[in-house]
Structures are given as C-alpha cells and as structure tokens.
C-alpha cells in the first residue's frame, strides 16, 4: 500500500510538473503578444525623452523611429556623425513635432572619463526610456583561439556588449530613482538563451545582458522602474546579413513595434511572437539536438562569410 501511494504521488507530481511548464510556455507566448494591450509608455517612463544606443542601423534605428512615433523626444547615440545626422533628419521628416538630439560615441572605447562626458550630455534631458541596444558580432563562428582578429576582436565584443548597458544604466538611473519612474530595455540575443559553441564570447556577453537586467530588476523593485531584457532571434538587419523577411525573420520596424508593446507585460522575452515560439521549443530540446543543429548552421555561416570576404563563389 505504501509503495502504491508513493507511486501515485510521484505520478501526480510529474503530471503537475509537466502541466506547470506547459501553462508557462503558453503564457510566455500569449500574454505579451496576444492578450495584453500596450501600456502607456509615457506614464511609466515619467519623462519625455528616450535614449537609444546603436541608433543608426537595424533594431536601434527602428526603436528610435517607433519611440518618436509614440511621441517621445529621442536622443540617439552612435559612432558615425554623418549617419546620426541623417537619422535625425529622417526621424524629423516623419515626426516634426518632437525633438531629436544626438551624440557620437565609439563604444569600443571603455574610457570612464569619456563615458562621464557622454552621460553629462544625456543627463541634460529627462530620460524616461533607455534602450541599451548597441552590440557587436563576430564575422563568423569560430573556436576561441581561431577568432578572426584575435584578442583585439574578442576584447571589442566583450566591451561593446557589456559596458554600455552597465555604465549607461548606472549613469541614468539616479534621475529615474528620483522620479520613481523609468524604463530600461537591454537588448540581448537569442544567443544568450543557450550555450553556443563557436559563438562562445558573443553568447556569454549576451547572457550577461540578460542576467544584469534580472539583477537590476530585483535591486530596484521598489523604485517604480521597469527593467526588460529582450532576446531576439533572427531579424532582417545589416548585422544579420540582411536575410529575407519571413514569419520567423521580421524586418526591424516590425520587431521594434512588437517589442515595445511587450514593455510592462514581460520582463524577459524575445520581443516577437514567432521568436518566442522558437525560444520555448528550443528550451525543450536536449543539448545534443541543439548542438548538432548549431554545428551545421555554423559551418554554413562560416563558408558563406569566408566566400564573401574572399570574393569567390560558393562550391
């Protein structure tokens, strides 16, 4: 009888465990993307300015345009002044009633003194939303000791993918804390969700972004500030090699619009429903299945990248 009760208890626990995870998966997919209406971002932000890094291309540029469309003044930060000037012009052509400022900064520069100068400029305005988007990618997947560009490239990826989100958050948070309102969105990557061979540094730095965001959320839980980590999969951007758009690979405008709608409804999410479906499926797969798929994808990616760099046709 005791054995029978034990077996029944174990069986019930297993069923409850499976049911819990099934419900969690369904909620992760449907709540932010189907059930909930977008929140009033201006009310939650508590201020009219949005700062976006890496704002002249891809996801960052689309975040800038979408925030401007929603009535925020935008402060765009990137490396190239000519691209910043053009982006400012393009935003104002579509949204002439807002204000756009820009600051040039090369985020491979880890100088604290230079960061303080940048933060001094940013703190001239009341920042309600900070989008830490700037990031860097290797040319192609490779083993750590064979990475193209050596330790210089490795250092740059680590610096760009970790320092800006950390230091800019630290520098902007004081004004958010004093207002008891604000939103900080850190853009990570699908690569931070699982351990990726031959993308070790990129994957690890994106995991840092996700982990940092979660820690800050706990740290400032009583200050009225929203912290969100976005972990997108493939988006049709220059950084991703400009792939064709599809259900699973949206353009950056579609992605940014979707991701902004999840603020206040999901603390950690991919930002796009198709990516969330991919993410939930991926988490269910055993490592050997993921590793085999990644290995095949890496080989194809590397072959294409090397062929392009050498300007030779693929075999």
UniProtKB/Swiss-Prot annotation:
EC nos: 1.1.1.-
Record Pfam families: adh_short (PF00106)
High-level lineage: Eukaryota, Metazoa, Ecdysozoa, Nematoda, Chromadorea
Annotated binding of NADP(+), by residue: 47-76
Keyword Transcription applies: no
Catalytic residues in the record: 202
Keywords: Lipid biosynthesis, Lipid metabolism, NADP, Oxidoreductase, Steroid biosynthesis
Superkingdom of this protein's organism: Eukaryota
InterPro entries cross-referenced by the UniProt entry: NAD(P)-bd_dom_sf, Sc_DH/Rdtase_CS, SDR_fam
Name this polypeptide is given: Putative steroid dehydrogenase 2
Cellular component per GO, a single term: endoplasmic reticulum
Family to which this protein belongs: Belongs to the short-chain dehydrogenases/reductases (SDR) family. 17-beta-HSD 3 subfamily.
Source species: Caenorhabditis elegans
Biological process terms in GO annotation: fatty acid elongation; steroid biosynthetic process
